[in-house]
Amino acid sequence: MLNGQKEYRVEKDFLGEKQIEADVYYGIQTLRASENFPITGYKIHEEMINALAIVKKAAALANMDVKRLYEGIGQAIVQAADEILEGKWHDQFIVDPIQGGAGTSMNMNANEVIGNRALEIMGHKKGDYIHLSPNTHVNMSQSTNDVFPTAIHISTLKLLEKLLKTMEDMHSVFKQKAQEFDSVIKMGRTHLQDAVPIRLGQEFEAYSRVLERDIKRIKQSRQHLYEVNMGATAVGTGLNADPEYIKQVVKHLADISGLPLVGADHLVDATQNTDAYTEVSASLKVCMMNMSKIANDLRLMASGPRAGLAEISLPARQPGSSIMPGKVNPVMAELINQIAFQVIGNDNTICLASEAGQLELNVMEPVLVFNLLQSISIMNNGFRSFTDNCLKGIEANEKRMKQYVEKSAGVITAVNPHLGYEAAARIAREAIMTGQSVRDLCLQHDVLTEEELDIILNPYEMTKPGIAGKELLEK
């Protein structure tokens, strides 16, 4: 059928009929969904598209295993799914990721694209559903309520693999920086006030340790994602799914995805509850909370360059101002802060969406997976950019840090065991009021000798457990 300059085909469902552009692979249900949900302007995440193709391929293979699906139809479905996994036809997934219907629109988008491509493979025209139907054949033994959660599990696990690799690389650079800066002494601060000396390497080692815990937490959070509810069909009872099909489809899912997937031991539970996603999201939130704190530290230590702390230098990535010539901003650290705000907000959305489930199904999974996959993706992209464009190039301004240590009254803490708290406090106060150093005041008041102060006020020794100048107390 021609309509103006375009050629169309007509498809029907129980609500009526619609004209579909003849060359597209999606069908009437996808078109209805795209008209109903023009929400975000975003596309379905490519890992979610691939995960849906994996599910459809596994289901076709399992249905052929149990002789429910004719071999010719099944192999055409498998080939169409493989083409999607090769990167083809992704532009045919047009429904908005945020949608009503618990993911039915996304599932039908996959069914129709795979179905119409399979029809072509079999030598038929798109939309000629008498030979192969998106619902009857591509969706055989399935419901959106097991297809969609299973695809969420697979896509999330795939993205987490990439994120964890990026985090391991970032952790390695933090460890390298900790070693590089191990001999660099700086002033430690609590309440943003001078405390006692610390090594810059110790601070970076602390960053590497918290990141190490985050990696471990995220790895552990994947545990329940390996359990899928494929075979649950509508409410977890497995209606219309052959028991042997259920066994085979999980086996094929594991083989195709390369993931150690297993069938959930209670399909009703696995169909109605979404705590596996909130567990992952919580670990991402904690990670970004920690990374944002690190970014705050880096921004503060790099403040200046003339009128701030200027203890470290961050790589200059771009001009920082449209009005102030020469200004450079800590844009990569600021990036981490903003990713943290987004991930923390996404986690709140995921919690609310998980709580909103009712009875046998959580219909809010579309907004849940949209935010979960976004969190993982922006963390992966952000960490990679931060590592390459900032972390690797951080330099220590040793001269500046040495000056701060020498000028600070905080080193009086090392003198405390030798003079007593009250006497040490008087010297500290005088140092703050007069601007003189603790060393000069101790000599001025004749409370310690030059040689004793060399031992007690050795800044490197102050960064290790013990009492500075302990041997002097034992005389």
Curated annotation (Swiss-Prot):
Lineage of the species this protein comes from: Bacteria, Bacillati, Bacillota, Bacilli, Bacillales
Binding, L-aspartate: 104, 143-145, 190-191, 322, 327
Molecular function, one GO term: aspartate ammonia-lyase activity
Gene that encodes the chain: ansB
Job of this protein: Catalyzes the reversible conversion of L-aspartate to fumarate and ammonia.
Record SUPFAM superfamilies: L-aspartase-like
TM stretches of this protein: none
Coiled-coil regions listed: none
Xref: NCBIfam families: aspA, PRK12273.1, PRK14515.1
GO biological process: aspartate metabolic process; tricarboxylic acid cycle
Translocase among keywords: no
Family membership: Belongs to the class-II fumarase/aspartase family. Aspartase subfamily.
Protein name per UniProt: Aspartate ammonia-lyase
Active site: 321
Subunit: Homotetramer.
PANTHER family: ASPARTATE AMMONIA-LYASE
